[in-house]
Amino acid sequence: MIELKRSFCRHFPLYSHFLMLLINSNIDVVFIQVTEIGRALIFLLVEYFFSKFQSMAPRPLRLTYRRPPPRFLFIILLIFIPVSMVGIFTYGQKISYFFRPLWDNPPPPFKRLSHYYAENVSMDHLCRLHDWSVRSEPRQVYDAIIFSNELDILEIRWRELHSLVTKFVILESNTTFTGIPKPLFFASNQTRFAFAEGKIVHDVFSGQIAAHGSREDPFALESKQRAAMNGLLQLAGISNGDILIMSDTDEIPSSHTVKLLQWCDGIPPVMHLEFRHYMYSFEFPVDYSSWRATAHVFHPRTLYRHSRQTDLILSDAGWHCSFCFRHIQEFVFKMTAYSHADRVKRRDFLDHSRIQNLICQGDDLFDMLPEEYTFQELFKKMGPIPSSCSAVHLPAYLIENADNYRFLLPGGCLRSPE
């Protein structure tokens, strides 16, 4: 036991340094120290058992039960505690997501509204299929988004809706949701959107820059921007009875969905819009899990939100293309800027070659498990997203300009660095 204690004392500074790294979250150095600790533990055990082996003398065999000596328990704890801390620190989120079906319950199911559409079918007939009636004139439509850096997706969205929307209301901030200063991407690229000039209502939100070495609460900053959108909508001239689309930039309602809401009477005052979810491009369809976008018949108490507001959802109403960027640097920006930036657990998550490989594989950028409430769905969605060769039923502008948007179509997974 004396030899064991002496060996432990020689390596104790290494353990102490490692624990301090965990406390200070110096992630890159932690993984180097894990290797060193493992080597130290091996040397410690070898020294201990070798000394015990040397001191052993032949003894008659005794078939009696002996309690495990305290020194053996000490060795087990010496190994178990740091390894457990590393495992929890590194894989805690993944472990939590794996056991989510045991500790969390799914939200109440939506009441799905059937959605009918085909080309060259009259609006009167489409309204009646939904048990609505056609209007004598269309409602005005306001499309309101909080913008970050998705310039390509923004153009596809506005081209899809341009003929139907009265005002495009866009709010951008000079900081990210995590309090990092950022350029005004839309303001510096307005000439690209000259086709919508006259319909654009744009404003800048003065964000709060985080103190050096800290981060602002991303959800609090996001909430403040959504509150600022309410005032901007009033400035845009929205009135009672107008249609208001609330969604993120990459949640794109289809033009025929907006036209249906614009021309039909009897629609629900609030409904969610179900979008087909894609990851990285339209080559990787995930499922129909995107539900946060909403369509409102505006009234004075309508507030801009991105959470569940009703049990009604209109099926197959558009597209949600997450992380659909042209350049690798745009992926890096979003990974560190948006509300879930805490998912970047290691610096190598932002490595350009790693990101490029994961895009082409359809695998998760954050090395996370799917957020599911049953083990059946969890196992079904684990691993890379199967790629698709279909580019049917996508935004018209995307297909018309396929050469410029090859990175969003099947077979175009390679990205340029910047």
Regions of interest found by a model, annotated:
Residues 240-252:
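Short beta-strand-to-loop acidic/aromatic patch adjacent to the donor-nucleotide binding site
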Residues 3-4, 8, 28-141, 380-418:
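Juxtamembrane luminal stem/stalk of type II transmembrane Golgi/ER carbohydrate-processing enzymes
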Residues 176-242:
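Active-site-proximal specificity loops/subdomain of glycosyltransferases
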Residues 140-142, 167, 243:
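Structural motif
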Residues 61-65, 313-418:
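C-terminal accessory extensions appended to soluble enzyme cores
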Residues 157-167, 171-175, 183-187, 192:
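Short, acidic, metal-binding catalytic loop of nucleotide-sugar glycosyltransferases
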Residues 251-351, 355-356:
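Conserved catalytic core of nucleotide-sugar-dependent glycosyltransferases
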Residues 138, 142-159, 163, 173-175:
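Active-site beta-to-alpha loop of glycosyltransferases that engages the nucleotide-sugar donor
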